[in-house]
Amino acid sequence: DYEKPSELFLGEKAAYDIDELIALMRCIKANPTYLTQGKADTVWPMFTRQSSYREDLLRLSTYFDGVKAHSADSYTSRWYIDETGTLQYTYSTEGMYDVLCYLSDMEAEGLIYSDCYDLTNKTNFRSTLWGTDESEAPAYGFITFDWQASSTADSLNKDIVVVLPPVAKVNGVWQYYIDNGRAIKPDGWSISVAGCATDAELYRSCALLDYFFTEEGSTLQNYGLPMFLKENETYTGPDGKEYPQYTDWVMETCASVAKGDLSTFLRDWLGCLIPIGYQKDIGFEYQYTSERGFEGWELLQNSTTHFATYAGEGIKGDNPNYYKMVPPVFSLTLRQKEAISETTTMGMEDLSEEMFNIVRYNAKGNAPNGISIPADYNEYLAAFEARNLDAYVTAYQ
């Protein structure tokens, strides 16, 4: 029972499916002048933060009957475990091919921001489409899949709200589900002896890694230099815990140069959050989360939405292993690595480019000369088989 139509999509009563979401996108696409009060003649219904995030579009696969794209938050986690307990490659499945065709239909209708696919374009589309409302030449976007704290930052746009995911038949059961579990990435948790010419260099490397697990080192990695923190003051998070508190300068400068995205500001301007193994603290993220961001967290936590977890548990359905996360990085032996590099070309970056060529050109039928688009799933699968998919999968299995 809805008091107004918008409740189908907004708030705790939201219960829309992917077809209804696409229908809403069509409404957004068709009414730019009305929606922007005459400021623009185009509103892009869906976009990714930047072109290097374009594989976030594939996360819509969950809402097309639960098709698996990634079994963790990383794009390299292109694996799932089937009902027999066997590791399988997600990008080569018929379900994924169908999803690419669905996305191509959306692209042909102008529902996806056209610059999202070009990896040479380094623009931050989120800043452009959500952060220019008050500029002389504003640009507008409607919806994206991204992290809540930075996406709801007040300095980016004060009108952004979090919504529940589409209801979908996931693992054979209708449910709310977000298949984007935060994975532990083991590639940042080791030191290669081969990279150290002497024992002294190895010991210094080990000391650096150890340092990040001391109180001082952890604070440095998560929050930055002491000068960035208030002396003798702490921040109380919504979990009741005390965390180091940033100075006003940090928050104000972050809003000015990074659109309120503190994670990006810390990494790109202040030099912390270095991708070397350390225990990440959520306290920095709490401090730049807006009131709408916290409302979004509360909405999701109080809903019946299910999430990917390390326990791999979820509503029972077709595949007992559906909810199990698969790491984005495997600790392969030298022999396994050699087998992959010598017998397959599955690791080439042009693989995802070929997939997005389907999105760009399949429905429109306008592929440039030299770009071949598979006519059906058999041709799509043949491209993987030509790269020796079987040997690649066997090495990981």
Identify the meaning behind each predicted range.
Residues 352-397:
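Histidine-centered catalytic/metal-binding microenvironments
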Residues 211, 215-360:
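Conserved small-residue motifs centered on glycine
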Residues 182-188:
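Short, solvent-exposed loop/turn segments at the edges of secondary structure
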Residues 4-7, 69-94, 169-180, 234-268, ...:
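Short, solvent-exposed loop/beta-turn-alpha elements that line the ligand-binding surface or hinge
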Residues 129-148:
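Alpha-to-beta junction loops
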Residues 5-14, 86-90, 335-344, 359-369:
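Second-shell loop/turn segments in exported
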Residues 151-177:
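Ligand-binding "clamshell"
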Residues 1-57, 78-124, 191-204, 210-222, ...:
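Helix-loop-helix "hinge/cap" segment bordering the ligand-binding cleft or interdomain interface
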